[in-house]
Structures are given as structure tokens and as C-alpha cells.
Amino acid sequence: MSIKLIAVDIDGTLVNSQKEITPEVFSAIQDAKQAGVKVVIATGRPIAGVAKLLDDLQLRDEGDYVVTFNGALVQETATGHEIISESLTYEDYLDMEFLSRKLGVHMHAITKDGIYTANRNIGKYTVHESTLVNMPIFYRTPEEMADKEIVKCMFIDEPEILDAAIEKIPAEFYERYSINKSAPFYLELLKKNVDKGSAITHLAEKLGLTTDETMAIGDEENDRAMLEVVGNPVVMENGNPELKKIAKYITKTNDESGVAHAIRTWVL
């Protein structure tokens, strides 16, 4: 069975350590498109953080799709039409904000148009996220967030501080939300059952594809859900060792154009 859809993570996967798309990766993706394969970027970033990549990779044609916010938003790239759009409630936000203060970690909330923090001492990783995804930062008190459509919240801090906080997150939080670590300094909290896997499953069904016709390429824990639902899970050589245990294939590192290697070896 030939592969007809490839879901590709960005950071640590699609781009190299300099956050660049190598010529080899660009070429492989264009060849896959020419062969009729759907290449879908699937990322924890908001849409603003992938816009330039979609342009650079020429993934804005009719019938092209993008998965952002770790699966909370799925859109047609040519029109912006939303196929899936999930968000947290204001009560969810308040509970997360309260827990972050109790655990002593920075938190920010992300909408489709900005990053919001209730901490006047804005964390350096919030600034990093703002730069990475090309979104502005706004200071708002929790009371001023009631009218915002919050797609996800993130606990962000130094890895050792964040890891210590994760150990203290109540079990009921894992029952209420989708929680996954996307980087050593990022913990993402979304609506329950929202992840890259649910988004890719929905998209594959919409396109009439079988599991065997799908591939996902990733490197970190927030890629686990999509790697588990496709027939051909590929993990980067630089990926999380735990993630490699569920891989069908291990490709080269992101600095060795691993996405291109995967496409040319197992797809084309």
C-alpha cells in the first residue's frame, strides 16, 4: 500500500538546529507533492508560527492542510477554512493559572492571535515562544481573560523547575486535559482528547485514507499520539529514546535532512 499522507513535526524534525529547511528537505517534499502525496505540517505552534514555512514549502495549494496547536486547530492552508477548532473554557484557564502559581512555574495562554501572561515578570521562555512563533505578548490579569478564546496553555520554565512541577500535577488534571511535553522547558495543556493523533485521524478519514496509507515523522513526546495512529511511524535519530520504541522506522537527524531521507527511502 503506497503512502498518501505524511504528517511532519517542525522543531527537531522538519527544520535543522538553525531552524532552517535544508535544500534536501525542500526537494523531497516537492517530489512527494508531485507524486500525489499530501504533506501536512503538524505542530504545537500556532498558525502564525508556520505561515512562512507553508509559503517556503509551497504548501498553500487547494487541498493542502495544516495541523497547529498540537491538534486543536486543523485548517485548509489555501483558504484558512477551519476543519477542527477546539478551545479551553475560562474555568479551565483559571484552574491552570492557579495550579501554575501553586507549583511555582511560569504560565502563558495562547489564542489564535497572541500570547497572554498574567505574570508581570514575563518568563524568558514566553519571550522565546513569542519570537519562535511570531506572535505578540500581552499582559492581562486573569479577570481580563474571560472573553478570550484560549486554545492552549503552557507551563514554561527552566527544565529542572518544570520537571519538579510536573511531578506535583494532580492526577485529576491528566483526566481533564491533554498534557504533553514538547520541549525540556515546555509543558502544553489542551482540551481533553485533543492531540496531533486525533487531528491526523480526522484528516485521514476525511480524505478516505487507510492507516497503512499514512506516515508521521516526529521527535518529541507531543508527537507520540500521531505516531501511534499512523501505519508508518518514523522517529528522528535525534528524537526522544522512549519515542523510538514505537517507531517502525528511524530516520537520520534533523541536521542530516532526516525528513528527506524518510520520504526518499520509504515513500517515493
Annotate the PLM regions.
Residues M1-L5, T22, E188-L268:
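Mg2+-dependent phosphoryl-transfer enzymes with acidic/Ser/Thr/Gly-rich catalytic loops
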Residues G36-V40, D64, K152, D212-E213, ...:
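Short active-site oxyanion
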Residues P23-G123:
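Active-site phosphate-binding/coordination module
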Residues E62, N70, F173-E175, V229-V230, ...:
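Short, structured coil segments at secondary-structure junctions
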Residues L99, L103-I217, N238:
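Conserved acidic, metal-coordinating active-site core of Asp-based
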Residues V25, V50-L54, A165, I169, ...:
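Hydrophobic packing residues within well-ordered alpha-helices of enzyme cores
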